Amino acid sequence: MAKEELIEMQGKVDEVLPDARYRVTLDNGHQLIAYTGGKMRKFRIRILAGDLVTLEMSPYDLNKGRVTFRHIENRTRTTPPARRRH
């Protein structure tokens, strides 16, 4: 499928599920199951309940989506930043 056909939406993570999946409520109230995109999985970007995310969805299946971006504006840091080794 071509990238132009994907629908991009924003939503809030309600629940973290096993196997890097999330229950997300979109801005329009629709709930779906989303999984972490490849680059986010590669760089181990953590997504927690309450995070605002951007999703890509196929127009053929609106019950599944792929998380492509995590917005970090209103979240506080719960762990100290990792130390860099020299």
Swiss-Prot record:
GO terms for molecular function: ribosome binding; rRNA binding; translation initiation factor activity. One of its GO terms (cellular component) is cytosol. Gene3D superfamilies: Nucleic acid-binding proteins. Keywords: Cytoplasm, Initiation factor, Protein biosynthesis, RNA-binding, rRNA-binding. The keyword RNA-binding applies. It is found in: Cytoplasm. It comes from the Bacteria. Residues 1-72 form the S1-like domain. Pfam families: eIF-1a (PF01176). Component of the 30S ribosomal translation pre-initiation complex which assembles on the 30S ribosome in the order IF-2 and IF-3, IF-1 and N-formylmethionyl-tRNA(fMet); mRNA recruitment can occur at any time during PIC assembly. Belongs to the IF-1 family. One of the essential components for the initiation of protein synthesis. Stabilizes the binding of IF-2 and IF-3 on the 30S subunit to which N-formylmethionyl-tRNA(fMet) subsequently binds. Helps modulate mRNA selection, yielding the 30S pre-initiation complex (PIC). Upon addition of the 50S ribosomal subunit IF-1, IF-2 and IF-3 are released leaving the mature 70S translation initiation complex. This is Translation initiation factor IF-1 3. It comes from Acidovorax sp. (strain JS42).
